[in-house]
Amino acid sequence: MNSQDLKKRQEKIRNFSIIAHIDHGKSTLADRILEKTETVSSREMQAQLLDSMDLERERGITIKLNAIELNYTAKDGETYIFHLIDTPGHVDFTYEVSRSLAACEGAILVVDAAQGIEAQTLANVYLALDNDLEILPVINKIDLPAADPERVRHEVEDVIGLDASEAVLASAKAGIGIEEILEQIVEKVPAPTGDVDAPLQALIFDSVYDAYRGVILQVRIVNGIVKSGDKIQMMSNGKTFDVTEVGIFTPKAVGRDFLATGDVGYVAASIKTVADTRVGDTVTLANNPAKEALHGYKQMNPMVFAGIYPIESNKYNDLREALEKLQLNDASLQFEPETSQALGFGFRCGFLGLLHMDVIQERLEREFNIDLIMTAPSVVYHVHTTDEDMIEVSNPSEFPDPTRVAFIEEPYVKAQIMVPQEFVGAVMELSQRKRGDFVTMDYIDDNRVNVIYQIPLAEIVFDFFDKLKSSTRGYASFDYDMSEYRRSQLVKMDILLNGDKVDALSFIVHKEFAYERGKIIVEKLKKIIPRQQFEVPIQAAIGQKIVARSDIKALRKNVLAKCYGGDVSRKRKLLEKQKAGKKRMKAIGSVEVPQEAFLSVLSMDDDAKK
């Protein structure tokens, strides 16, 4: 095709994504659009078609973004090329959303006609507005008995400030309103800007590792054209590769002759080393490079850190390779090697949140067959020492000696909790119990309230979300942003087994709750750790001071069984001998700590604050 034809083709391209809160029907709507445009035959169709990971189907959530090309013949008789980029809706995967929005010009905002706007909807809409996208509101699930489309239409206008007068009323499940949505995409979403004759600039928004073809890049072509045989160059590190194949996804990968401006597709170039590519990087041609890289993504900083250790120590290298492959298409995952006296060699990993951590752990165990032990998650503290240094600490075992600490700052988040009016009391009580400071409260409509608190991230990391759902019967929705660091009265608590510190069980706790938490954890460990041949004391200590103790009684063999009657001094001699043996055993004996013990540090949180 000459550049004139390519420019005409470019005018027919529409790139859009679907944004919504969890469970508002995003993946179902994507399924209907695929059916309506006959991208997928009814024989191949299955629910949640774009959620290709087993984990996504089981949990009913979207974790990874997906990009698909569809052809749609509009009412004006022209055929348009749609690129649908599916996005996750959960707070931990905001990074995935921001990446997919950077590859689009428009976004369909799906709002549940019964539930209205939720916290996550707002967060993702603001991301879309930051990227200057054209937003098309769609009110979904209008066939539900509790649906109230007019109320939701007003909510969209009042809370978000979008004109919802032309919002499509739809039911993705029943297939109502799908055609109107497609027509609105044609009319309202702008065609991609960009120049086909300019040097190639392609934004990498995702990548996957293929054992045969190496790293496969998913790209959005912003300027220029790329075809197989071209020599491409990464703009961040200058490395060059020969393109072996370009193509698009129609969920399946289909090879093409070229990808031109406005296209969304994949590029394979025999990239063998995982570290050579980075999501957010710009690809250009080696013989005619672009002058500057595209504006990438803001790098997300991990909020939660935990240690990951293979149960079998010879799997350490396998774990490293697995983490590198996961990092390819999950750029927000960070890791570095660490060692623990209790657990051996492993990695300290940074995650965006607890669900992210959970998903990574499950993917490592399923996709790479590695059995893992995970330590309790922790956040990044700023420790100011007496010699006026500031150290960032994400691992409790790296905390400096208490005598060197001047003060400690911990991260606070601004939490937005949307909840029906009747549960406001429960939400406030929970937030206060988690050391939260009340900021403000806005009424969205007669019944729904947006409550804003400043809460320490460390309190949210454990089980805030579960507690919030149970105290509001599942009605609350929740979103948080990093706010600031504040001084707090924090101490490091060590757990001693048989007089030895177990580094992997150390955790940071607020002074106020230290005594109760210490007491609860030693009692929990007493139940979990199996009895030994000798007595094992479990102690919780802050610095040198022991704040709680519990003993696991020794298992004991009845050495008097063979003495029927007989002399008492004979019995005493046998008992003394047993006692001496136990003493010797205790001096050299080591205690096996089961995996549950590490997790019990997490779940004790609730008991401490009842």
Swiss-Prot record:
EC top class named in words: hydrolase
TM region(s), chain numbering: none
Signal sequence residues: none
Molecular functions (GO terms): GTP binding; GTPase activity; ribosome binding; translation elongation factor activity
Residues annotated as domain tr-type G: 11-193
SUPFAM superfamilies: EF-G C-terminal domain-like, P-loop containing nucleoside triphosphate hydrolases, Translation proteins
Localization per Swiss-Prot or TrEMBL: Cell membrane
Keywords assigned: Cell membrane, GTP-binding, Hydrolase, Membrane, Nucleotide-binding, Protein biosynthesis
Swiss-Prot/TrEMBL GO biological process terms: positive regulation of translation
Enzyme Commission code(s) on record: 3.6.5.n1
Membrane topology reported for the UniProt record: Peripheral membrane protein
Gene Ontology cellular component terms for the protein in this record: plasma membrane
Residues given in the record as GTP binding sites: 23-28, 140-143
Catalytic activity: GTP + H2O = GDP + phosphate + H(+)
Function noted in UniProt: Required for accurate and efficient protein synthesis under certain stress conditions. May act as a fidelity factor of the translation reaction, by catalyzing a one-codon backward translocation of tRNAs on improperly translocated ribosomes. Back-translocation proceeds from a post-translocation (POST) complex to a pre-translocation (PRE) complex, thus giving elongation factor G a second chance to translocate the tRNAs correctly. Binds to ribosomes in a GTP-dependent manner.
Record-stated family: Belongs to the TRAFAC class translation factor GTPase superfamily. Classic translation factor GTPase family. LepA subfamily.
UniProt name for this protein: Elongation factor 4
Species whose genome carries this gene: Streptococcus pyogenes serotype M2 (strain MGAS10270)
Lineage: Bacteria, Bacillati, Bacillota, Bacilli, Lactobacillales
